[in-house]
């Protein structure tokens, strides 16, 4: 296993798929990274030389990934809550934030049904 950005990246997978195991790197960004360092996206990580691995590390260092990205997201949500915005209120109440209906559906966000005893 190769360690990139604090994550053990699987070396038996294609470069794009392996890079997607890093939080904050999706398919399109992984393809962009492979293209910029000149690696075929179907090359397995284990077959890459140390030079290309270092190039990959340097390219990924340009982006906000892993712990920094998680911290940034939680701070953004905390800021919304502290400001008292509508979105912050929805986050605090564990309800959908982006205008989805809540009379029916929204079970993932609201959690399991609460039983009402009559």
UniProtKB/Swiss-Prot annotation:
The keyword Cell membrane does not apply. GO terms for biological process: translation. GO terms for cellular component: cytosol; small ribosomal subunit. The keyword tRNA processing does not apply. Keywords: Ribonucleoprotein, Ribosomal protein, RNA-binding, rRNA-binding, tRNA-binding. InterPro entries: Rbsml_uS13_C, Ribosomal_uS13, Ribosomal_uS13-like_H2TH, Ribosomal_uS13_bac-type, Ribosomal_uS13_CS. Located at the top of the head of the 30S subunit, it contacts several helices of the 16S rRNA. In the 70S ribosome it contacts the 23S rRNA (bridge B1a) and protein L5 of the 50S subunit (bridge B1b), connecting the 2 subunits; these bridges are implicated in subunit movement. Contacts the tRNAs in the A and P-sites. Part of the 30S ribosomal subunit. Forms a loose heterodimer with protein S19. Forms two bridges to the 50S subunit in the 70S ribosome. This is Small ribosomal subunit protein uS13. It comes from Blochmanniella floridana. The lineage of its organism: Bacteria, Pseudomonadati, Pseudomonadota, Gammaproteobacteria, Enterobacterales. The gene is rpsM.
């Amino acid at each position: 296993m190769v360690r990139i950005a604090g994550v053990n990246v699987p070396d038996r997978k294609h470069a794009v798929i392996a890079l997607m195991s890093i939080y904050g790197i999706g398919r399109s960004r992984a393809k962009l990274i492979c293209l910029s360092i000149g690696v075929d996206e179907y090359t397995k990580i284990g077959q890459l030389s140390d030079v290309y691995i270092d190039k990959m590390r340097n390219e990924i260092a340009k982006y906000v990934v892993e712990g920094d990205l998680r911290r940034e997201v939680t701070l953004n949500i905390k800021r919304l809550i502290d400001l008292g915005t509508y979105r912050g209120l929805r986050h605090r109440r564990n309800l959908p934030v982006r205008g989805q209906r809540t009379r029916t559906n929204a079970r993932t966000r609201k959690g399991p049904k609460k039983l009402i005893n009559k």
